[in-house]
Amino acid sequence: MKNKKLLVMAGGTGGHVFPAIAVAQTLQKQEWDICWLGTKDRMEAQLVPKYGIPIRFIQISGLRGKGIKALLNAPFAIFRAVLQAKKIIQEEKPDAVLGMGGYVSGPAGVAAKLCGVPIILHEQNAIAGLTNKLLGKIATCVLQAFPTAFPHAEVVGNPVREDLFEMPNPDIRFSDREEKLRVLVVGGSQGARVLNHTLPKVVAQLADKLEFRHQVGKGAVEEVSQLYGENLEQVKITEFIDNMAEAYAWADVVICRSGALTVCEIAAVGAAAIFVPFQHKDRQQYLNAKYLSDVGAAKIIEQADLTPEILVNYLKNLTRENLLQMALKAKTMSMPNAAQRVAEVIKQYSN
C-alpha cells in the first residue's frame, strides 16, 4: 500500500522551521512520506535537506519595508507563487498540507485549497501573523501554541525537540547546587544586540556573586569580548550553543528574547527566565512571554526599560529557592505531546 504524504509549508526563521521538522519526524516514524515547500533564499533551503526531507521552492518574499514598486508588483508576485505552488501540489499529490508560517505558507495554502487538499494550520505565537490570519479562514483545522492567537482553535503547544523533555526535573537539577547562581544569556542565532551591550556592564558589578555564560550570536564574539574588557575571564562566551538542552539545564536563570519557540523550550526543560521581548509592532514576543510570566515562571523587562542597573538590582535579589519555584512553574506550562497531537490532527483530516 502506498504511503500517505504530507506537504509542509514553512520557512524563514527557526521558529517556523524547527517545530515543523518535529512534526515531520513524528509522521516519518509512522510511515508517512514528507515533502517540504519553501523559498531558496531562506534558512529552510539549507536546513531541511539535512534532515533527509526533500524540499521544493516557490518564489515569494515579504513586503514589510519594501518600496512602492514591490507593493505594486505584489499581486502579480503572489499570483505567480500560487501557480508555482499549485503545480508542485499537483505533482506531489499530498494527502494533507501543514502550514507552520513564513511567507511561503500564504500562496501555498491558497494553492492547496484550489487543489482540494486539507489544510492544517499551526500558529506558533501568542498573536497570529497576517498569513495565518488569512489562511485561518480557509484552513480545514487551526491549531495554536498559546490560547490567545485564535478564539476557538485547539491549544497544542509548540513542537520542540524531544531532548528538552528528557532533562531531569528542576528540583533534581537544583538539589546539589550550592555555588554561585548560574546565569545563561541567550541571544539566539542572530544575537540580541541589546543583551550583548547590556550584559558586560552587569557582569562588571556581579561577577563575584554570579556565574555567567553568554551566547552572543554569529560573528559577535570579538566585539562582545572587547565590551567585557577586564571582566572577560568572568564569563564564558560562545557564538552558538550546540546543546541547548544541556545549557538550559545548567542554568539557574535564563536571560533571552521571547520568541515562541524559546518560550516553549524554557517551559519544556523547566527553567526560570528573564525575557526581554523584541519590540514588534504587534507585541508578539511580549504576549509570548506573558504565557510564563502570568504564572510566576518568568520576569519581563521591556527593551525600552532595560538598563544594567535594573538587571543588576533584579539579579542580586534572586535566590536559588525562588528560581527553583519559577522553574517548577515553567515546567507545569509545558506541553510535551505537541508534535504528536499535530500529527494526529493531520492524520484525522488527511484525504
Curated annotation (Swiss-Prot):
Listed Pfam families: Glyco_tran_28_C, Glyco_transf_28
Membrane topology, record value: Peripheral membrane protein
Residues annotated as signal peptide: none
UniProt cross-references to InterPro entries, sorted A to Z: GlcNAc_MurG, Glyco_trans_28_C, GlycoTrans_28_N
Keyword annotations of the record: Cell cycle, Cell division, Cell inner membrane, Cell membrane, Cell shape, Cell wall biogenesis/degradation, Glycosyltransferase, Membrane, Peptidoglycan synthesis, Transferase
Pathway: Cell wall biogenesis; peptidoglycan biosynthesis
Predominant location: membrane
Any one biological process term the GO annotation gives: cell division
Localization terms from the record: Cell inner membrane
A GO MF term: undecaprenyldiphospho-muramoylpentapeptide beta-N-acetylglucosaminyltransferase activity
UniProt GO cellular component terms: plasma membrane
Catalytic activity as recorded in UniProt: di-trans,octa-cis-undecaprenyl diphospho-N-acetyl-alpha-D-muramoyl-L-alanyl-D-glutamyl-meso-2,6-diaminopimeloyl-D-alanyl-D-alanine + UDP-N-acetyl-alpha-D-glucosamine = di-trans,octa-cis-undecaprenyl diphospho-[N-acetyl-alpha-D-glucosaminyl-(1->4)]-N-acetyl-alpha-D-muramoyl-L-alanyl-D-glutamyl-meso-2,6-diaminopimeloyl-D-alanyl-D-alanine + UDP + H(+)
The keyword Oxidoreductase appears for this protein: no
EC class (word): transferase
Function of the protein: Cell wall formation. Catalyzes the transfer of a GlcNAc subunit on undecaprenyl-pyrophosphoryl-MurNAc-pentapeptide (lipid intermediate I) to form undecaprenyl-pyrophosphoryl-MurNAc-(pentapeptide)GlcNAc (lipid intermediate II).
Record-linked NCBIfam families: murG
Family indicated by similarity: Belongs to the glycosyltransferase 28 family. MurG subfamily.
Official protein name in the record: UDP-N-acetylglucosamine--N-acetylmuramyl-(pentapeptide) pyrophosphoryl-undecaprenol N-acetylglucosamine transferase
Organism, as annotated: Haemophilus influenzae (strain ATCC 51907 / DSM 11121 / KW20 / Rd)
